[in-house]
Amino acid sequence: KFKKLSGGGYFKIINQSVPAALKNLGYSEKESEAIIKYATDSASFAGAPFINHQSLSEKGFIADEIKRLDAAALTAFEIGFVFNKYTLGEECLQRLGFTPEQYNDFEWSLLEALGYTDEQIEAANDYVCGTMMLEGAPLLKEEHLPVFDCANKCGAKGQRYIHAHGH
């Protein structure tokens, strides 16, 4: 879920009963960390599928720009929001071959312009920003999913929830 900060802004947290429940279900600390990371985020492009430090470097990004992307990923809810002139600077975008007309257009996607597919962007987004759900988490056994069901579907792709008659 998202926690609103008193000074403005939001950050992602997981219900504090989740780590305890995972422990009680017999998951190791390492397994629990992987499950929680799936839901919340890795907050870095390091190791992300498709859009990662190596692929970004191959596309022409320099180390400092990749560091800026990682720093912006710490608070991002979608990776598309960090790939812009404000994070990277116009010099970077021009060096990569893009024009002010392109990167000043709010409809324009740098990730798509770099050749990434919607599926690749979605996979990287899930890794970097988290899925906001436990469904599909690595190592989480299917039979344990009901333990984590709640009143609403979680995340953009969540399907499970407790029906109103179950409350």
Predicted features along the sequence, with ranges:
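Long, C-terminal-biased catalytic regions of enzyme "large/alpha" subunits
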Residues: K1-H167
